[in-house]
Design a protein with these regions (language model features):
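Glycosyltransferase catalytic domains, chiefly GT-A lineage
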Residues: 1-145
């Protein structure tokens, strides 16, 4: 969990309600975007990465036939079973994407899922907000930069 949220509920209860044997990773869906092209544009507008990196990743995904509408995670809340092989492999592949291509995690995570045919569980925003409260810290940071 990053600094976008404050904990307001019982985390033991939260985990008991979401964890299943079927899934090893849990994320929120991105609240505003579900296409990689939209995320590329946003990263470019906010200058969160260099144009060179953005174009390089775009071209790579295009060559691999990565579908534009493959969903996007909202990386502020990640719940994972750390000793699950599927989770470990996914995280290692994701790290390699970030290390070698773009440091923007939301550009690469859904690509890794697609590339390896892996599944995650998307958590309902309404459900999560029983346990976490957004604090808009990222919005405040952007205003003052």
């Amino acid at each position: 969990m990053d600094c976008s949220f404050n904990i307001i509920g019982n985390l033991d209860d939260f985990l008991l309600r979401i964890l299943t044997p079927k899934h090893s990773m849990y994320f929120l869906e991105h609240p505003k975007r579900n296409k990689i092209s939209q995320e590329f544009k946003r990263v470019e507008i906010l200058k969160k990465d260099t144009i060179n990196n953005i174009e390089r990743v775009k071209e790579r995904y295009k060559k691999k036939n990565f579908p534009d509408k493959s969903g996007l995670i909202y990386g502020c809340l990640i719940i994972r079973k750390h000793n699950d092989k599927n989770c470990i492999d996914t995280m290692e592949e994701w790290f390699d994407e970030i290390k070698y291509y773009s440091h923007r995690d939301q550009l690469s995570f859904n690509y890794v899922l697609w590339k390896f045919g892996r599944k995650i569980k998307y958590l309902s925003k309404q459900f999560c907000f029983q346990y976490f409260k957004g604090n808009n810290i990222h919005r405040k940071i952007l205003i003052f930069q």
